[in-house]
Amino acid sequence: MGANTFGKLLAVTTFGESHGPAIGCVIDGCPPGLELAAEEFAHDLQRRATGRSRHTSARREADEVEILSGVYEGRTTGTPIALLIRNTDQRSKDYATIARQFRPGHADYTYWQKYGIRDPRGGGRSSARETTMRVAAGVVAKKWLKQRYGVIVRGFLSQLGEIRPEGFAWDAVEDNPFFWPQAAQVPELEAYMDALRKSGNSVGARVDVVAEGVPPGWGEPIYGKLDGELAAALMSINAVKGVEIGAGFGSTVQKGTEHRDLMTPLGFLSNHAGGIIGGITTGQPIIVSIALKPTSSLRLPGETVDVDGHPVQVITKGRHDPCVGIRAPPIAEAMVALVLMDQALRHRAQCGDVGEMSPCILENVGFRNADD
């Protein structure tokens, strides 16, 4: 099974299944000298973890990272960093009734068609459990980016079903289980999710990620465009069905005079490009958004077929998220950070002696457009 590694100078390989003994990753290409301890992974892993609120899966994993290699006396050595997390709360019996059925909307059918065999326990390799190791690898990338360049990568839930934020404050994002930027709306979200969970249904969501402090010049033209690599990385996350960068699909209704980001000696006047033009960073905040579909693991019966092609009714038991988007911000942050670190290393390798060319336009608008 291929395609378990991504990145060029910073290459990350993940392995393991949802109900296997462990999951892990290997980070190859991290520069030496970065201080790193197992305890540093706990914060972001807990942000992603299930069981954080009644609105996520009830599965409870300790998610304690073991550093197997690549770190000596608390510092990275420049050799591959191997991380391992042992699974401790599997409940494989929940999947006994669907072992020979294809759950609609899941990868059961496509894995079966491709490999002729599949692990039905929690989706096996296709489970969102795999994203735990992306978040772990992202901890390394976030720390390196912040220390080396002052880059900060943050995400938030920007839409839950039809509900959108009525205001914005970064301080609010980490103070509620929804990563929601408007504290006053949290009771509304709680009530919405309670009703949804009782009905046995699920709902989609949107997550925004903002990378601030990124220098101009990162990325490559044509086939190595930064926005292309960000899109590919984010589309690899479970349940993601769409990616926007900057104004995204909203640019289809804009005029050129609206969309172009005018420049002055004091900075850009807007950021419809999302911080990337021609595949290369402008120095403005990078703004990306992802659309996550509603999970197909439902207690409501639905039509499907079994491995013999016979029609059956499927009801998915077990512990599942009624909205996978609620836990997605740390995952999306990690993927953005890993792509940026890889691009930073590539830029340093090819163009490290170029520096920032004059004029370097100052950033004078935040991640939200000045005309929003």
Swiss-Prot record:
Complexes and interactors: Homotetramer.
Binding-site residues, FMN: R125, S126, S127, N238, A239, G278, K293, P294, T295, S296, S297, R319
Main function: This reaction introduces a second double bond into the aromatic ring system.
GO MF term list: chorismate synthase activity; FMN binding
Keywords: Amino-acid biosynthesis, Aromatic amino acid biosynthesis, FAD, Flavoprotein, FMN, Lyase, NADP
Family matches, as InterPro entries: Chorismate_synth (IPR000453), Chorismate_synth_AroC_sf (IPR035904), Chorismate_synthase_CS (IPR020541)
One Pfam family cited in the UniProt record for this chain: Chorismate_synt
Designated name of the protein: Chorismate synthase
The protein's annotated pathway: Metabolic intermediate biosynthesis; chorismate biosynthesis; chorismate from D-erythrose 4-phosphate and phosphoenolpyruvate: step 7/7
GO cellular component entries: cytosol
Top enzyme class: lyase
EC number(s) per entry: 4.2.3.5
UniProt similarity note: Belongs to the chorismate synthase family.
Positions that bind NADP(+): R48, R54
Co-factor binding details: Reduced FMN (FMNH(2)).
GO terms classed as biological process: amino acid biosynthetic process; aromatic amino acid family biosynthetic process; chorismate biosynthetic process
Reaction catalysis annotation: 5-O-(1-carboxyvinyl)-3-phosphoshikimate = chorismate + phosphate
Claim: Flavoprotein is one of the keywords in the record: yes
Co-factor(s): FMNH2
